[in-house]
C-alpha cells in the first residue's frame, strides 16, 4: 500500500457495503499498548475495515516492534493472529498469550 495514499473518511456507501471473512492488516508500529499508524486517513480506514471483518490478521515485521506513532488503530485483542518474520522479545510472547492472540513466525 502506498503510504501516501489518501483514503476516504466518513460515510462512504461503497465501503459500508464491504464484508470480509478474513482481512490482513499492516501497521506502522506496535508497542505493549497497541497498534499504530502515522496517517489519520489510513488509521480511520483500517478501523472501519476491521469492523467489517470476521477474522483479522496483523502483519508486522520485526522493525515495527517497540515503535509508536500518532494514531492508535487498535489493541492486540482486536486481532485473531499476528504474523511476523522472527520470534519477538519475550514480553510480546507473554502479551500475545495473555490476549489470546495466535503468533506466527518462521522457525
Per-region residue spans from a language model:
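Conserved phosphate- and dinucleotide-binding cores of soluble alpha/beta proteins
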Residues: 1-107
